C-alpha cells in the first residue's frame, strides 16, 4: 500500500492548512491519484487494522439500494450512525442514487443494473459511468456523496475502475474507499465474466483532520505487510446476489488498529 502511505506523508509534510465544514481544521492537498493493480493482491491497508465487516456490509448495503441504517445496525456496522435521523434514515444517499436515480421526469433509473448490462453489451463503451451526485437531491441527503462518480474500462478481458472522490478523509475514510471500490470491481468483473485490472483512485480535496496528525505519524512508522487475497464465491454471477458469506479476505495480518475521532 505504498501509494496510500505516500499520500499520507505528503499531506502531513506539504498540505495547506484549511478550515472545514466540521470546524475541526484540516491539512489538505488538491488533486491526487493512486493506482492499484488488483492482480498484485487486494489493496487493504496493513499498517493499521481495518474493520472488514464494515467495508463488506456497507458495499452490500449500497448495492441493495438501501438508505436506512437498519441493515447496518443488524450486522454490527456503526459507520453511518452519526448521520442518521431518529428513524435511521439518511435521505437519498449512495444506494438510492446507484439503484433508483430519479430523473427530471420522475422515472427511476437503476444505474448499476444498466452498468452490468452495458459492460456485457458494449465493453468498449466510454460511458460506463455511475454518479451519486444527483444535484436535485443533494439538499435531502444527510451527507453529500464524497465518493461521487466512478467509471469502468475494459481491455484485454480485464475490468478496471476509476473513482473520483471529491473529498477524502485520508486517515479514516480513504482506506475504506480503496477497499470498497476494489471489492466492487472484483464483483462487477465476476458478474460480467471478466478478469480484473487496475483500481485508480482520484481525489479532489484530500485532507487529514488536525486531530488525526499524531495517528498518521504513528502509522507511518510501521512497515507495510503482504497484501491479502480476495476470494469470491465463484457460483455467484449476479452482482446483486452476493451475500456476506460469499466474500472472503484471506491472509490479512495487519498492525493493530489506531483509534481516531470521526469529524461529523
Curated annotation (Swiss-Prot):
One of its GO terms (biological process) is dTTP biosynthetic process. The active site is at 146 (nucleophile). PROSITE patterns: THYMIDYLATE_SYNTHASE. GO terms for molecular function: thymidylate synthase activity. It is an enzyme of class 2 (transferase). It is found in: Cytoplasm. DUMP binds at residues 21, 126-127, 166-169, 177, 207-209. Pathway: Pyrimidine metabolism; dTTP biosynthesis. Its main location: cytoplasm. (6R)-5,10-methylene-5,6,7,8-tetrahydrofolate binds at residues 51, 169, 263. Pfam families: Thymidylat_synt (PF00303). It catalyses: dUMP + (6R)-5,10-methylene-5,6,7,8-tetrahydrofolate = 7,8-dihydrofolate + dTMP. Its EC number is 2.1.1.45. Keywords: Cytoplasm, Methyltransferase, Nucleotide biosynthesis, Transferase. One of its GO terms (cellular component) is cytosol. Homodimer. Catalyzes the reductive methylation of 2'-deoxyuridine-5'-monophosphate (dUMP) to 2'-deoxythymidine-5'-monophosphate (dTMP) while utilizing 5,10-methylenetetrahydrofolate (mTHF) as the methyl donor and reductant in the reaction, yielding dihydrofolate (DHF) as a by-product. This enzymatic reaction provides an intracellular de novo source of dTMP, an essential precursor for DNA biosynthesis. Belongs to the thymidylate synthase family. Bacterial-type ThyA subfamily. This is Thymidylate synthase. It comes from Xanthomonas euvesicatoria pv. vesicatoria (strain 85-10).
Amino acid at each position: 500500500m505504498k501509494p496510500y502511505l505516500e499520500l499520507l506523508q505528503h499531506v502531513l509534510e506539504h498540505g495547506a492548512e484549511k478550515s472545514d465544514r466540521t470546524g475541526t481544521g484540516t491539512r489538505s492537498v488538491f488533486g491526487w491519484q493512486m493506482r492499484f493493480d488488483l492482480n498484485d493482491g487486494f489493496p487493504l491497508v496493513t499498517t493499521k487494522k481495518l474493520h472488514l465487516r464494515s467495508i463488506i456490509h456497507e458495499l452490500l448495503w449500497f448495492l441493495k439500494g438501501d438508505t436506512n441504517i437498519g441493515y447496518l445496525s443488524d450486522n454490527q456496522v456503526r459507520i453511518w450512525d452519526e448521520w442518521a435521523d431518529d428513524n435511521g434514515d439518511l435521505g437519498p444517499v449512495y444506494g438510492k442514487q446507484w439503484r433508483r436515480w430519479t430523473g427530471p421526469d420522475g422515472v427511476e433509473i437503476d444505474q448499476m443494473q444498466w452498468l452490468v448490462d452495458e459492460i456485457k453489451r458494449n465493453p468498449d463503451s466510454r460511458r460506463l459511468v455511475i454518479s451519486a451526485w444527483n444535484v436535485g437531491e443533494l439538499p435531502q441527503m444527510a451527507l453529500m456523496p464524497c465518493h461521487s462518480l466512478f467509471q469502468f474500462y475494459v481491455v484485454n478481458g480485464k475490468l478496471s475502475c476509476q473513482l473520483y472522490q471529491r473529498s477524502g478523509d485520508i486517515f479514516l475514510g480513504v482506506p475504506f474507499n480503496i477497499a470498497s471500490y476494489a471489492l466492487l470491481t472484483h464483483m462487477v468483473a465476476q458478474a460480467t465474466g471478466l478478469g480484473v485490472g487496475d483500481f485508480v483512485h482520484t481525489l479532489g480535496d484530500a485532507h487529514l483532520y488536525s486531530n488525526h496528525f499524531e495517528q498518521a505519524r504513528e502509522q507511518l512508522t510501521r512497515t507495510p505487510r503482504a497484501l491479502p487475497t480476495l476470494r469470491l464465491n465463484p457460483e455467484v454471477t449476479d452482482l446483486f446476489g452476493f451475500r456476506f458469506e460469499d466474500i472472503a479476505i484471506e491472509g490479512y495480518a495487519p498492525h493493530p488498529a489506531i483509534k481516531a475521532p470521526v469529524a461529523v
